[in-house]
Amino acid sequence: MVKVGVNGFGRIGRLVTRAAFNSGKVDIVAINDPFIDLNYMVYMFKYDSTHGKFKVDIVAINDPFIDLNYMVYMFKYDSTHGKFKGTVKAENGKLVINGHAITIFQERDPSKIKWGDAGAEYVVESTGVFTTMEKAGAHLKGGAKRVIISAPSRDAPMFVMGVNHEKYDKSLKIVSNASCTTNCLAPLAKVIHDNFGIVEGLMTTVHAITATQKTVDGPSAKLWRDGAGAAQNIIPASTGAAKAVGKVIPELNGKLTGMAFRVPTANVSVVDLTCRLEKPAKYDDIKRVVKQACDGPLKGMLGYTEHQVVSSDFNGDSHSSTFDAGAGIALNDHFVKLVSWYDNEFGYSNRVVDLMVHMASKE
C-alpha cells in the first residue's frame, strides 16, 4: 500500500484524508499544515458540516498554520460533510485516526518537510499554492518520490481518471489531478465525443462556494465582482476547466471553453455542456451510450440517474460526474444540452486517491 503525505489540511486535504481512510487504498502517514495545531486538526477532521462525521492509511500531514489540536477539531467536525464517525485524537504529538498515528509537520517551505523520515512516498499538494512543477517539486527534496497536485497546473501533466489515466508513465514525478470541474466534464465529453463527435461546445458550471470567496464584500485580486459576498450573490466567474479537457482529450483541444456561476450553496456543483455533434443522435441515443459507459469502463467515476434529483442529493457522492438524463434537452439531432452533477469536494478527493493507487500500480 502506497504511503502518502498531505500538504495543507484545508477542504481538499481533509477530504482526501477521509477518502483515503474510507477506501483503505492508500496509507496516510504524514500531514503538514503550519496554521493548525494538532487538536484543531482532530476536530476539523472528525466533524464536517457537509459530509458528516468521519467514518476511515495516511502517514504524514503538513500545515504550518494549524496546530495539532486544531487539526483534530477540523478533521472531526465538518459543516458540510458532518461529524467524523471514527475516532480521532491528538496523542504524543501525532494525529491519531481510528488508532492510526499520523506524523504532523508545520512547515511553510515544502522543501523543509521531512516526508522521507515519516515514510511518505507520495505527497498530495493540496494548499492551492504550489501548483507548478518547480514549486511542487520542492516536496521531492524532503524525500517524497512523487507529488500529486490537487488543482490544475500550468505545466504539470494532467490526468483524469477514466479519461487519460492510462497515459501515465512512471517516469513522471509530478502530476496534476486537474480540477473538480474538469473531472466532471471530461468523462462525459469523452463518451459523447467517442460516440458522436463533438464539433464544438460551451460549458457552464453552476458551482458551490469555495474557500477562495469572500464571506462579505471585500477586495479581489482578480475580477472586482469575485470579491462580492459569496452567500449573497450569484457571481459570474472564469474557469479553465473546459479548456483543460483539451489537455486530457487532445482531439477536443480548442473545441471547448466555458465559464462558471458561483452560487450560494455549500457544496455540490453541476455542469451544463452545450455542444454541437458531428454525427446525428437522438437524445435517447445519448442516454443509452452514457448509461453503457457508467455500467462499463467508467463505472464508479461516471454515474447516471433518471430521478428528479437536486444538488443536495449528491452531497457525499463519490462519482466524478453523474449524468442527469432528465435535465438535458436537444434542439435537434446535432445540438444538445447535457447536465451532470458532482460533489466538488468529495468526488474529486476520491479521484485523487484513485490516481495515487493507479500510479503506485505502475511502480
From Swiss-Prot:
<dbReference type="GO" id="GO:0005856">
    <property type="term" value="C:cytoskeleton"/>
</dbReference>
<dbReference type="GO" id="GO:0050821">
    <property type="term" value="P:protein stabilization"/>
</dbReference>
<feature type="binding site">
    <location>
        <begin position="179"/>
        <end position="181"/>
    </location>
    <ligand>
        <name>D-glyceraldehyde 3-phosphate</name>
    </ligand>
</feature>
<keyword id="KW-0810">Translation regulation</keyword>
<keyword id="KW-0206">Cytoskeleton</keyword>
<feature type="modified residue" description="ADP-ribosylcysteine; by autocatalysis; in irreversibly inhibited form">
    <location>
        <position position="180"/>
    </location>
</feature>
<dbReference type="Pfam" id="PF02800">
    <property type="entry name" value="Gp_dh_C"/>
</dbReference>
<feature type="modified residue" description="S-(2-succinyl)cysteine">
    <location>
        <position position="180"/>
    </location>
</feature>
<feature type="binding site">
    <location>
        <position position="108"/>
    </location>
    <ligand>
        <name>NAD(+)</name>
    </ligand>
</feature>
<dbReference type="GO" id="GO:0005829">
    <property type="term" value="C:cytosol"/>
</dbReference>
<feature type="binding site">
    <location>
        <begin position="239"/>
        <end position="240"/>
    </location>
    <ligand>
        <name>D-glyceraldehyde 3-phosphate</name>
    </ligand>
</feature>
<feature type="modified residue" description="Phosphoserine">
    <location>
        <position position="269"/>
    </location>
</feature>
<keyword id="KW-0013">ADP-ribosylation</keyword>
<dbReference type="InterPro" id="IPR020829">
    <property type="entry name" value="GlycerAld_3-P_DH_cat"/>
</dbReference>
<keyword id="KW-0597">Phosphoprotein</keyword>
<feature type="modified residue" description="S-(2-succinyl)cysteine">
    <location>
        <position position="275"/>
    </location>
</feature>
<dbReference type="InterPro" id="IPR020831">
    <property type="entry name" value="GlycerAld/Erythrose_P_DH"/>
</dbReference>
<feature type="modified residue" description="Phosphothreonine">
    <location>
        <position position="257"/>
    </location>
</feature>
<keyword id="KW-0520">NAD</keyword>
<feature type="modified residue" description="Deamidated asparagine">
    <location>
        <position position="98"/>
    </location>
</feature>
<keyword id="KW-0324">Glycolysis</keyword>
<feature type="modified residue" description="Deamidated asparagine">
    <location>
        <position position="92"/>
    </location>
</feature>
<keyword id="KW-0391">Immunity</keyword>
<feature type="modified residue" description="Deamidated asparagine">
    <location>
        <position position="7"/>
    </location>
</feature>
<keyword id="KW-0399">Innate immunity</keyword>
<dbReference type="GO" id="GO:0004365">
    <property type="term" value="F:glyceraldehyde-3-phosphate dehydrogenase (NAD+) (phosphorylating) activity"/>
</dbReference>
<feature type="modified residue" description="N6,N6-dimethyllysine; alternate">
    <location>
        <position position="222"/>
    </location>
</feature>
<feature type="modified residue" description="Phosphoserine">
    <location>
        <position position="150"/>
    </location>
</feature>
<dbReference type="GO" id="GO:0006006">
    <property type="term" value="P:glucose metabolic process"/>
</dbReference>
<feature type="modified residue" description="S-nitrosocysteine">
    <location>
        <position position="275"/>
    </location>
</feature>
<comment type="pathway">
    <text>Carbohydrate degradation; glycolysis; pyruvate from D-glyceraldehyde 3-phosphate: step 1/5.</text>
</comment>
<feature type="modified residue" description="Phosphothreonine">
    <location>
        <position position="239"/>
    </location>
</feature>
<keyword id="KW-0007">Acetylation</keyword>
<keyword id="KW-0808">Transferase</keyword>
<feature type="modified residue" description="N6,N6-dimethyllysine">
    <location>
        <position position="291"/>
    </location>
</feature>
<feature type="modified residue" description="Phosphoserine">
    <location>
        <position position="176"/>
    </location>
</feature>
<feature type="modified residue" description="Phosphothreonine">
    <location>
        <position position="181"/>
    </location>
</feature>
<feature type="region of interest" description="Interaction with WARS">
    <location>
        <begin position="1"/>
        <end position="176"/>
    </location>
</feature>
<dbReference type="GO" id="GO:0045087">
    <property type="term" value="P:innate immune response"/>
</dbReference>
<feature type="modified residue" description="Phosphotyrosine">
    <location>
        <position position="70"/>
    </location>
</feature>
<feature type="modified residue" description="N6,N6-dimethyllysine; alternate">
    <location>
        <position position="255"/>
    </location>
</feature>
<keyword id="KW-0832">Ubl conjugation</keyword>
